């Protein structure tokens, strides 16, 4: 077994946001949560190093992960990646296991499989990337597949900057190695910080083996600005789309479809172009038509759209919800709502038809109220149901009706102003003075 230390103490100033960098999301999930999931997939001892907005990050983490060990970096005394794992006396933080994997919190694309080459090493090891454009990364100087030196870009000379082998920001150390060399770290560099990479110099001077393990670039993309966040999100989206299609989901123009990590699919599903699925959603044996938005909802044995919007807590089963229909906190069972309706805070029974322009008026300016509609109900176009109201089963509501009172089962309900036809009314209205 091994312990995992995740470095998350930085300010993330290049994000230009009051939100901590690691809480910025990819596909609906904070970046930090991805790396924590990976950490717990390989270890039962996960440590998180915090400083900037640490209480905010800790609160978010504890809502999802209960086994994290939190530490506060002593930034005022020990800044930098090396300082992050130091205690007051410069010894490494306490861990359960002798092998320690160190990861950066701003690398949300790392997976267990991507780390496998590094974890197979029996020595101290550093993950490397070979980049065509290594700008922004620390350079790694190798000799016989062993690390001889790591130079941060800020401290590199022109010859060192030409090297394409760069530090991936992933380290595997034995605890005894850290105990021996961490107290020797100093901050005599351009940034006045303690660098983890400097540990290699101490080890090399005493003939310690430090393996250079090349890793796949896609999995170790660091996120330091909004442009990099967007790039990482597109990679994550490609993974989610592929996973869905591997389950048999049909996607029309996949690159136009957005879905988040909490979306799950069952049975035969079709997603047309421009569909957006966000939050925790279940899509089961469903056809989501073009440019529809589904949020925190369940769509089962149903068709939705095009241009429909299922807002949170919508459960649509054995139903058809057509174009420009919006639902919110709605339960539809065997319902047809073809077009241009708002169905909020309602329950609608089987074999009910909702005409065009029907609105459940759920808000009175102070509180939300519920509309209950039974089975075998026909609601004519352009009707308003003013909640709270209950419509029984086998009810017919005429077009243009405003319902303010409960309707018993078996009734016909109408509320219309009588129509008046005035002979020659057109000519009288437009008569010239």
Curated annotation (Swiss-Prot):
First-listed, main subcellular location of the protein, grouped into a coarse class: cytoplasm
InterPro entries xrefs: Bifunctional_GlmU, GlmU-like, GlmU_C_LbH, Hexapep, Hexapep_transf_CS, MobA-like_NTP_Trfase, Nucleotide-diphossugar_trans, Trimer_LpxA-like_sf
GO molecular function, one term: UDP-N-acetylglucosamine diphosphorylase activity
Binding locations of Mg(2+): 106, 224
Record: residues binding UDP-N-acetyl-alpha-D-glucosamine: 7-10, 21, 80-81, 138, 152, 167, 224, 311, 328, 342, 353
GO biological process: cell morphogenesis; cell wall organization; lipid A biosynthetic process; peptidoglycan biosynthetic process; regulation of cell shape; UDP-N-acetylglucosamine biosynthetic process
Subcellular locations according to the entry: Cytoplasm
Functional note: Catalyzes the last two sequential reactions in the de novo biosynthetic pathway for UDP-N-acetylglucosamine (UDP-GlcNAc). The C-terminal domain catalyzes the transfer of acetyl group from acetyl coenzyme A to glucosamine-1-phosphate (GlcN-1-P) to produce N-acetylglucosamine-1-phosphate (GlcNAc-1-P), which is converted into UDP-GlcNAc by the transfer of uridine 5-monophosphate (from uridine 5-triphosphate), a reaction catalyzed by the N-terminal domain.
Assembly notes: Homotrimer.
Name of the protein described by the UniProt record: Bifunctional protein GlmU
Organism from which the protein derives: Helicobacter acinonychis (strain Sheeba)
Gene of this entry: glmU
